[in-house]
C-alpha cells in the first residue's frame, strides 16, 4: 500500500515537472464509408486508406509472392536472410549460421527444378509436415515459382486429422522430417493419393522398405536439390496470378474436422504490403521465428520481414532453448502469443519475490509509478529513462536487449500483461487481431498509439463492420457501438476448400463473420470484448462470457491453464484447472506434504487455497457473482494438442474438454446442488 501511495505521489509531482505531457493517443484512426447497411453499423476503414484498400505495391510492381521473392532477393542480395543453429558432432547447438538472400533464392530454384524433374505440375498441392526449419521455408518459397499450393500440417496433429487433410486437399507429394516420417507413411497407408514423400533428413533402410510395400516413392531433400542442380534451369517458371491459390490453411478446429481456408497470392500479398503501415519493418531488423509455420500469423510475419529485407533467425525446436536463442540473436522484433507473455510476467514477478525486502520495495515502487503513468496516459520522459536504466534494463536483456516492437496475436492480451510488457521491456507493445480467413492480419494497434487495450484500426487491406447481436444486447448503432466483427477486402479468403455449406454459413454477402464481438472506441480504434460462440446463458437467464472469466482466473499464481464451464440448467459456472507445477511444489514444501502433483491436485486444503485466490481475483476485477466459479477441479495433466484438449494454435477444445472431464463436472455440480 505504501508503494502505491508513493507511486501516486511521485506520479503527481512528475506530471507537474513534465509539464503534464501526455502519451500519444491518436484520434480519427478509422473513417466511416458508404451508406449505412441494412444489417449492422457503418463500414469502417483505416483512415490512411479511406479511398481504396491495398492489394499490392504498385510502385514496386509486387502483385504476388513470386514478385516479392524475386525482387527482394535482387534488392538485398548478400545481406543476411535466414539463420539457424547447427548441431556439432556432440549434438550441441552452436551460434546462428546465416545464408544470404541470393543463396536462399538459389536453393529455392534448385528445389522447384527438382520437383519439376519428378513430374509435379503447376498448381499441384504440396504438403509440408515438419517443425520450423530452413528447408520448410525454402519449399514454401519454391512453390511460388511453379504456382504450387502449399498445405502445411501442425507437427503434433494425430494421424486421423492428417489423413483427412491429405485426402481432402488431394496431396500427392509431401515433405516431412525424420521425426514425422513414420507418421507420414502411416497416412499413406490409408490415403492412396499420397505417392511421393520427401524427407528433409536421411532415411534408414526400414523406412525405405515400408514405403516400397505401400507403393510410395521416398526421396531425401538433398536428392531433390541434386536433381534441381542437374536440371540446369531447363524448366521455365510458371508464375502465379494474384488469384492463384497459394496455400490452403487448415484451421485446427475446436469441433469437427479441420476447415481448409483458401488463401490466394493476392490475399497474402495485400497483408504483407499493409504490414508496413503498422510495424514499419526495416532491412536492419532481426526477427526471431518460433511460432509454428503452420500458424498463419508467423507465416505472414516471415513474408513481411523477408519482403523488407530483415534477418530472420529460426527456432531450433527445443522450447527450453527459446530464451537462450533470443539472447544469442538479439531480435528487434518479437512476435508472440499471450500464453508466452503471461509466462514471462509470472517468471519475472517470481524472481522479484525472491529478492531482499528493500530491493522488492524499490522495484515495486518503480513498477507502480510507470504502470500508473501508462494507465492514466501521462508521459514522464526523464523519470522513465532513469527507471528503465536502474530497474528494468536487466529484465529487457531477457529478450536480447534490442527489441523495439513486441507484437501479440492469436488471442486477446490482458490489460495487466500489456502494461507489464510496456513497463519492463521498455518498447512499443502492439496487439494484433486476425483470423486464418483474414490471413492473420486484420487489425493492429498503431506504433504512435500509446494507449492500452485496443487492437487499433483495420489493416489497409481490409475493412470492418459490426453486426448487431440482439440476443446478447450488442447494438452496432448504439451510443457505444458493439457487435460481431465482420471482415471484407483483398486480404480476406473467399471461403473453405470443397465446403460450400460452411462457406455460405460464415461468408455472407462477401463478409466473413468472425464470431468475435468488437467495440468501436472514441478514437476510432477497435477492441475485442467478447466471443459470440463462447457465450452461454445460465438457468437464471444471465449470459456468461467464458473467455472474459478465464482471462481473470489465469492471473492467479496457482493457475497455469483454465477452462470455464457452464450449463444452461445450472445457475453457476465451474472451472477445470491445470495448476502451475512450481506453485504446487512450493505450497507442498511449505506444508511439508507430498510434492507429487497428482497428490497435490487431490489435496482439499490446496484446492481451497486455489479457489479462494481465484474468488479474490474475480471480485477484485469486478466480476458479477454468477461469473465467479463456485467449484474447481484440478488436473495434473496439462491441456495440450497431444491429448486433444488444445488446438495446435493453443485454443481450448471446449467440446473435448467437456467430454474428457464429464465425470468430474457432474461431481462438482452434484456437490453444489
Swiss-Prot record:
Signal peptide start-end: 1-18
Entry's EC annotation: 6.2.1.3
Keyword Ribosomal protein recorded: no
Gene3D superfamilies: N-terminal domain of ligase-like (3.40.50.12780)
Enzyme class: ligase
GO MF annotation: an example: ATP binding
Protein name: Fatty acyl-CoA synthetase B
Known glycosylation sites: 267
GO cellular component: endoplasmic reticulum; endoplasmic reticulum membrane; membrane; peroxisomal membrane
UniProt induction comment: Down-regulated by Pseudomonas aeruginosa, PAO1 strain and PA14 strain infection.
Database matches in InterPro entries: AMP-binding_CS, AMP-dep_synth/lig_dom, ANL_N_sf, LC-FACS_euk
Any matching Pfam family: AMP-binding
Domain of life: Eukaryota
Family of this protein: Belongs to the ATP-dependent AMP-binding enzyme family.
Protein's job: Long chain fatty acid acyl-CoA synthetases catalyze the formation of a thiester bond between a free fatty acid and coenzyme A during fatty acid metabolic process.
Amino acid at each position: 500500500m505504501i508503494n502505491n501511495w508513493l507511486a501516486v505521489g511521485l506520479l503527481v509531482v512528475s506530471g507537474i515537472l513534465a509539464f503534464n505531457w501526455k502519451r500519444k493517443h491518436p484520434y480519427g484512426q478509422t473513417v466511416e464509408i458508404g451508406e449505412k447497411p441494412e444489417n449492422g453499423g457503418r463500414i469502417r476503414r483505416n483512415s490512411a486508406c479511406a479511398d481504396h484498400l491495398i492489394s499490392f505495391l504498385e510502385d514496386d510492381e509486387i502483385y504476388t509472392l513470386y514478385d516479392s521473392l524475386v525482387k527482394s532477393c535482387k534488392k538485398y542480395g548478400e545481406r543476411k536472410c535466414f539463420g539457424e543453429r547447427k548441431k556439432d558432432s556432440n549434438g550441441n547447438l552452436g551460434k546462428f549460421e546465416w545464408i544470404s538472400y541470393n543463396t536462399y533464392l538459389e536453393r529455392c530454384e534448385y528445389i522447384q527444378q527438382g520437383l519439376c524433374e519428378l513430374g509435379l505440375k503447376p498448381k499441384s498441392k504440396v504438403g509440408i509436415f515438419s517443425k520450423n526449419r530452413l528447408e520448410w521455408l525454402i519449399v514454401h518459397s519454391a512453390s511460388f515459382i511453379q504456382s504450387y499450393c502449399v498445405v502445411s500440417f501442425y507437427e503434433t496433429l494425430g494421424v486421423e486429422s492428417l489423413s483427412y487433410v491429405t485426402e481432402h486437399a488431394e496431396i500427392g507429394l509431401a515433405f516431412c522430417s525424420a521425426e514425422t516420417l513414420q507418421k507420414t507413411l502411416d497416412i499413406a497407408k490409408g490415403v492412396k493419393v499420397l505417392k511421393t514423400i520427401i524427407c528433409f533428413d536421411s532415411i534408414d533402410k526400414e523406412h525405405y522398405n515400408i514405403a516400397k510395400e505401400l507403393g510410395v516413392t521416398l526421396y531425401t531433400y538433398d536428392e531433390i536439390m541434386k536433381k534441381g542442380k542437374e536440371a540446369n534451369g531447363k524448366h521455365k517458371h510458371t508464375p502465379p496470378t494474384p488469384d492463384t491459390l497459394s496455400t490452403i490453411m487448415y484451421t485446427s478446429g475446436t469441433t469437427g474436422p479441420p476447415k481448409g481456408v483458401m488463401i490466394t497470392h493476392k490475399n497474402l500479398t495485400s497483408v504483407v504490403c499493409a504490414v508496413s503501415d503498422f510495424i514499419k519493418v526495416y532491412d536492419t531488423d532481426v526477427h526471431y521465428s518460433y511460432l509454428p509455420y503452420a500458424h498463419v500469423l508467423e507465416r505472414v510475419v516471415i513474408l513481411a520481414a523477408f519482403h523488407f529485407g530483415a534477418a530472420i533467425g529460426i527456432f531450433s525446436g527445443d522450447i527450453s532453448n527459446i530464451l537462450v536463442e533470443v539472447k544469442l540473436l538479439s531480435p528487434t522484433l518479437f512476435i508472440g502469443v499471450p500464453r508466452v507473455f503471461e509466462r514471462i510476467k509470472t517468471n519475472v514477478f517470481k524472481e522479484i519475490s525472491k529478492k531482499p525486502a528493500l530491493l522488492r520495495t524499490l522495484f515495486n515502487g518503480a513498477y507502480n509509478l510507470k504502470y500508473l503513468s501508462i494507465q492514466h496516459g501521462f508521459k514522464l520522459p526523464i523519470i522513465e529513462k532513469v527507471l528503465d536504466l536502474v530497474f528494468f534494463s536487466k529484465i529487457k536483456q531477457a529478450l536480447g536487449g534490442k527489441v523495439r516492437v513486441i507484437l501479440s496475436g492469436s488471442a486477446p492480451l490482458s490489460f495487466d500483461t500489456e502494461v507489464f510488457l510496456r513497463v519492463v521491456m521498455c518498447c512499443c507493445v502492439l496487439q494484433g487481431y486476425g483470423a486464418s480467413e483474414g490471413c492473420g492480419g486484420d487489425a493492429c494497434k498503431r506504433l504512435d498509439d500509446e494507449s492500452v487495450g485496443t487492437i487499433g484500426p483495420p489493416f489497409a487491406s481490409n475493412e470492418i463492420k459490426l453486426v448487431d447481436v440482439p440476443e446478447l444486447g450488442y447494438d452496432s448503432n448504439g451510443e457505444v457501438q458493439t457487435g460481431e466483427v465482420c471482415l471484407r477486402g483483398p486480404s480476406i479468403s473467399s471461403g473453405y476448400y470443397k465446403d460450400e455449406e460452411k462457406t455460405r454459413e460464415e461468408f455472407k454477402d462477401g463478409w466473413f463473420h468472425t464470431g468475435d464481438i468488437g467495440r468501436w472506441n472514441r478514437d476510432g480504434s477497435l477492441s475485442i470484448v467478447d466471443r459470440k460462440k463462447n457465450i452461454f446463458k445460465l438457468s437464471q437467464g444471465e449470459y456468461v462470457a467464458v473467455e472474459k472469466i478465464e482471462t481473470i482466473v489465469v492471473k492467479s499464481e496457482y493457475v497455469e491453464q483454465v477452462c470455464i464451464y457452464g450449463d444452461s440448467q445450472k445457475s453457476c459456472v465451474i472451472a477445470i484447472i491445470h495448476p502451475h507445477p512450481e506453485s504446487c511444489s512450493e505450497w507442498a514444501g511449505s506444508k511439508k506434504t507430498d510434492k507429487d502433483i497428482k497428490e497435490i491436485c487431490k489435496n482439499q486444503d490446496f484446492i481451497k487455497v486455489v479457489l479462494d485466490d481465484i474468488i479474490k481475483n474475480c471480485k477484485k476485477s469486478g466480476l458479477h457473482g454468477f461469473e465467479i466459479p463456485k467449484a474447481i477441479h484440478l488436473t495434473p495433466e496439462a491441456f495440450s494438442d497431444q491429448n486433444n484438449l488444445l488446438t495446435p494454435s493453443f485454443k481450448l477444445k471446449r467440446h473435448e474438454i467437456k467430454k474428457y472431464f464429464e465425470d468430474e463436472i457432474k461431481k462438482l455440480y452434484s456437490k453444489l446442488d
